[in-house]
A protein has these predicted regions:
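SDR active-site strand-loop-helix element
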Residues: 7, 31, 72-78, 113-119
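Short beta-strand element of Class I
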Residues: 27-29
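N-terminal Rossmann-fold cofactor-binding loop
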Residues: 31-36, 55
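Rossmann-fold cofactor-recognition segment
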Residues: 44-58
Length: 143
């Protein structure tokens, strides 16, 4: 059985991943910040393990003994709305948090790390995005 880790699980992509895990019989460790207003949306299910871990805590977070996973999905990001989108100190901190997540993935035994971006990296685009779409971010969140 595959075992995965998900950050940003209370967002749209994260919630869809949790549902997919349950349907496919994949065990998932959900890392969620303590003050998340949407933590209650995470389903209680035998395949879903829930642990509190803020982005700023990933650097020092230690897995339990014998805790090992295959794939780490990193969907968490701070400052995705309002004026925080242009707070470059916070957006740069997100880069550091992502590096911390990569290191945590290693401590958890993950052989694969998948990090998701957003449309903000492309700016305003007519039509569908694809791997050849030029990036023209319009705010710090997109950079």
């Amino acid at each position: 059985m595959r075992r995965i880790v998900i950050t940003g699980a209370t967002g749209t992509i994260g919630m869809a991943m949790i549902g997919l895990c349950i349907r496919k019989g994949v065990e998932a460790l959900i890392l969620c910040r303590k003050d998340s207003a949407r933590a209650g949306r995470i389903p209680v299910h035998p395949l879903i393990r829930f642990r509190y871990c803020d982005l700023s805590q990933m650097k020092d977070w230690q897995p339990e003994e014998q805790e090992s996973y295959d794939i780490f999905y990193h969907f968490a990001w701070a400052g995705t709305t309002g004026t925080a989108r242009n707070d470059m100190y916070l957006q740069n901190k997100n880069v550091e948090y992502t590096l911390d997540a990569i290191r945590l993935a290693g401590r958890l035994g993950c052989h694969t790390f998948i990090g998701a971006g957003s449309q903000a990296e492309y700016g305003r685009v007519e039509g569908k995005l694809n791997e050849n779409t030029p990036v023209r971010p319009e705010n710090g969140y997109g950079i």
